[in-house]
Amino acid sequence: MMQEKKSNTKVIRNEKFGGERPLFATHDLRLENVTITDGESGIKQCQNIEAYNCKFYGKYPWWHVDGAKIDNCYFALGSRSAIWYTNDLVMTNSRIDGPKFFREMKNLTLENVEITDADETFWKVDGIRIKNVKLHGGTYPFMFSQNIFVDGLESDSKYVFQYCKNVEVHNAKILTKDSFWECENVTIYDSTLDGEYLAWHSKNVRLVNCHLAGEQLLCYTEDLVLENCTIDPMCDRMFEYSTVEADIRGHIENIKNPTSGHIVADSIGSITIDENVREPNNCVIEVRNKRYEL
């Protein structure tokens, strides 16, 4: 049933659409309890679309849409590559089971969203705001994206945040290896980062009140800052070939060949400086009140 609102926004309630492009080029449309069944490109080349309590099953259901709100909706496994080339989208209180969501976009906001297959999700997005989002499975979420703000993220997806710029993260629990590779301008607060090879080959990385776990963390990193961070006792070979300013609370097991900077911790298991260290080789390392100059 379709009806006209005073605002000239059309409302569609309790309908099902299938086939190819059933709502192509529509605008100023509100969908309530609508199901997009098997088919392709259910909503495409549209403007100002709202969806509430809707379900999406077909492929590519939401492409080339400018201005959208999605609330309390479900995207099934078959709705792969669902939301691409879409700008100014707000999604809340929804669940996504399909892979390869959110690509080539600008201004994306998610709150209270769970993505159960985060494979190749959030690629080439400029302007992401996330609050209370869960990512499971898949590889390389957030790749090539920039201007990202996160407050509340749980992720066990592999290789998150690679080739990203201008990233601010709060209250995250990230379990993966190779996260934050080849990134620029990253600040992470009050988070747990668990996985090998954190932030290799990145620039301007700042970690504040974070807990780190994994092997060979923070290597080949330029302009690295750690403030009031803790390190899992199993971590080793940290800071190799990095320029670093680090204030570590508690113990760090092994530091290897930092290039320059200043590292202080309450205790240090061992320091490895060998013939492969790079110039200028002038990092100052302290066990509070006991100093080593390399």
PLM regions with names:
Residues 1-294:
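Long, distal/terminal scaffolding or interaction modules
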